[in-house]
Amino acid sequence: MENTEKLKNSKEIVAYLVEKFPACFIAEGEAKPLKIGIFQDLAERLADDARVSKTMLRSALRQYTSSWRYLHGLKAGQARVDLDGNPGELLTEEHIEHAKQALKESKERVFASRRTNNKEEKAKQPRRPAPRKADAAAKSDKPKAAPKAVVADAPLVKVDAANLKVDQGVRVVLGKSPVPATIKEVTKDDVQVQLQTGMMLQVKFEHLVL
């Protein structure tokens, strides 16, 4: 008996589209530019498919086409493809420039969020009070002590995947410093989170900390 259980989130739907239309949707690497109006084609092809709703399909398609790897694939000379992988019209210069700008803005939002998080972490660190003049003069006569060994920061607390919930606040390790985020979807293999900038990311459990 065919499985008719509804797909629960965008990741599952994208994986389903990759399986059902492998000549059009790519799971890894640079994605192929999609034909304009491909949502309507998908809606017609999947009209009798009880596993996919139009609302979830639209959300999954939006996530797929706004991903960095999809935007990277929009280059001069590339042709848009339909669901069967047949090439159509070539990308216009306007669409290529729009993709470059969208990719640039998306990366800038992530990096800006990292910088903001770094500043917030530094601001939370307690400051030592300035020494009084008399104390400073007395200390200036003493020999300088050998530099102390650098004390490592306390280790980050990894999340327990079994206890993660939608709308829970976590931090995403994107570089040297974790970035605040809110959980939007929890799947078997990873989590969809929303950064403070509004950007949505799909990350593995090991990249989340409290």
Swiss-Prot record:
> Localized where?
Cytoplasm
Primary subcellular site in the record, as a coarse category: cytoplasm
UniProt GO cellular component terms: cytosol
Which InterPro entries would you find in this protein's record? ProQ, ProQ/FinO, ProQ/FinO_sf, ProQ_C
Q: Which UniProt keywords apply?
A: Chaperone, Cytoplasm, RNA-binding
Give yes or no: UniProt keyword Chaperone: yes
Q: Give the Gene Ontology MF terms in alphabetical order.
A: RNA strand annealing activity; RNA strand-exchange activity
One GO biological-process annotation of the entry reads: post-transcriptional regulation of gene expression
From the UniProt entry, list the residue stretches annotated as the region Disordered.
Answer: 103-148
Asked whether the UniProt record includes Chaperone among its keywords, one would answer yes
Bias class Basic and acidic residues marks the residues at 103-124, 132-144
Name one matching Pfam family: ProQ
Summarizing the function annotation, the protein's role is: RNA chaperone with significant RNA binding, RNA strand exchange and RNA duplexing activities.
Which family would the database say this protein is a member of? Belongs to the ProQ family.
Record-given protein name: RNA chaperone ProQ
Species the sequence originates in: Aeromonas salmonicida (strain A449)
What taxonomic ancestry is recorded? Answer: Bacteria, Pseudomonadati, Pseudomonadota, Gammaproteobacteria, Aeromonadales
Q: Which gene name belongs to this protein?
A: proQ
